[in-house]
């Protein structure tokens, strides 16, 4: 039995789920907003907020952790330059999830997740 499961499964094996969340996190940091399903957006929120919090710390260890997660090295350097200035007054809540219309093919709940 899986009591108090904390990780959303998203209908995928663990390796595929981690790769998908890494890709979505990279895209969110690069573009500033991503349109995806509501469940994926909620799972992405945790990862993106963790990366921004690490970028606010600015230490070498946190930079290496983000480099190991985000796919684009130049994007990590840009994140570490702008995140402390952009989010200095916030202690969390760096993203916003807005619900949109359902997807036409399978009627899945869609959402836009964007950086505040």
Swiss-Prot record:
Question: Listed GO molecular functions?
Answer: structural constituent of ribosome
* Ribonucleoprotein found in the keyword field: yes
Q: Which UniProt keywords apply?
A: Ribonucleoprotein, Ribosomal protein
Q: Which GO terms describe its biological process?
A: translation
Q: Offer a single GO CC term for the protein.
A: cytosolic large ribosomal subunit
- Any coiled-coil regions, as ranges: none
The regions listed as transmembrane in this protein's record are none
Presence of keyword Ribonucleoprotein: yes
Q: Which InterPro entries match?
A: Ribosomal_bL17, Ribosomal_bL17_sf
Q: Which family does it belong to?
A: Belongs to the bacterial ribosomal protein bL17 family.
This protein's assembly is summarised as: Part of the 50S ribosomal subunit. Contacts protein L32.
Q: What is this protein called?
A: Large ribosomal subunit protein bL17
From what organism does this protein derive? Synechococcus sp. (strain WH7803)
What does UniProt list as this organism's lineage?
Bacteria, Bacillati, Cyanobacteriota, Cyanophyceae, Synechococcales
């Amino acid at each position: 039995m899986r009591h108090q499961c904390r990780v959303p499964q998203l209908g995928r094996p663990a390796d595929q789920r981690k790769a998908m969340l890494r890709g979505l996190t990279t895209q969110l940091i690069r573009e500033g907003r991503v349109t995806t399903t509501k469940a994926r957006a909620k799972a992405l929120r945790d990862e993106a907020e963790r990366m921004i919090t690490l970028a606010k710390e600015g230490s070498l260890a946190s930079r290496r952790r983000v480099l190991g997660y985000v796919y684009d090295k130049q994007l990590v350097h840009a994140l570490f330059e702008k995140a402390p200035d952009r989010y200095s007054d916030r202690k969390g809540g760096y993203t916003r999830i807005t619900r949109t219309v359902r997807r036409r093919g399978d009627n899945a709940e869609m959402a836009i997740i964007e950086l505040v």
